[in-house]
Amino acid sequence: MSRPHGIPLPSARRSSDSNETESAFDDDKQGQPRPREGVRQLTGAERVRTLVESNASVSLTLPGARDCRAFDEFGTGMPVARTVTPDGDVILLVSGESAAARAAAHAQDDDLTAVIEITDVAPVSVPHRIRGRARLTGWLTPVRGDDRPACAALLAERRPAAGLPAPDGPPEPPYAVSPAWTMLRLEVGEITLDDLWGAEHVEPEALAAAEPDPMAAHETELLQHLYAAHGDRLGTLCGLVGARGAEHLTAVPLALDRLGLRIRFTGGAAGPFDARFDFPEPVADICGLRRAVHTLFSAAAH
C-alpha cells in the first residue's frame, strides 16, 4: 500500500472560455480554493444527489408567482423533507398552508415553474464557509393518486419523524380540509452546481442514476469531532503536503466523502489553502471511515 499524501488544491482562476459557467467562488469574489485536474472526486450528479438528500439549507421559489392572499411575489420557505424518486423527480414535503401547496393545487395541469436552491455550509467555523450551492429548476405538481403511497414511503425513509401518514393511507387529494402537510413533485429540467470542485451543469438523467454519498449522514458529526478533539493531529497532516511554516498553520476539517478528506489550512502568509487527502480505498461505512482517517494520521506521524 502506498503512503498517503495530501494534494494541495490551488485557488481558481477565472476561465478565459466565455462559454464556461462562471463560478460563484472565483478568486476575486470568495477566495475559495479549487482542485487540480485528476483529483479523485464524486461526480457532479453524485454531489447534487447528496445535497438533495442531505440536511443542507433549502429554499423553494416560484418565479413570478403571486400569492392570492398577498398581492406580492412570494417565496415558499423551506420544505421539511425531500428525496429523489427512481425517475429523478424531487419529492418535497411542505406545509399544506404554504404558498407552494396552494399554487400547485390552483395550477392543476398547467406548468408551474419552480426553483429549488440548496446551500451547503461547512459544519465548523472556517473562512469561506459556504461549500457549495445547487440550483434545480423544473415544474411543480401535487403528488396524486397511486403515486402518493410510494412517495410517502420514500419521504418516511428519509425523515421518519416528519409526521407522514402510513404508506397505505387514503389517496384523496392532499389539499382537502387544510392538512398539516402535502407532497409536491418537482420534475427537474435543469441543474447547476457550484461547489468546492467547480461550477458545472448536471443532466437530470444523471441525477436519477446517481446515488448519494454514503458518508453524508455522518459528515457533520465526524468533522465536528475531528475539529474539537483532534486538532493537533489534523495539524500534522500538513507535513503530507510539504507546506512550509506548518507550525504556524491551523488545520480545519472542511469536507469528507467516501473518497477522501479535505482540510483547509489557515494562518499562512499566503492565505488559506486546501489539501485533499485521498483514502486508500473508497469507504462504505463509519468503521471503514475511521480506519481510513487513522491511516492518514499514522502516515503523518512517521
Predicted regions and their residues:
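An N-terminal domain-cap segment
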Residues: 3-8, 27-104
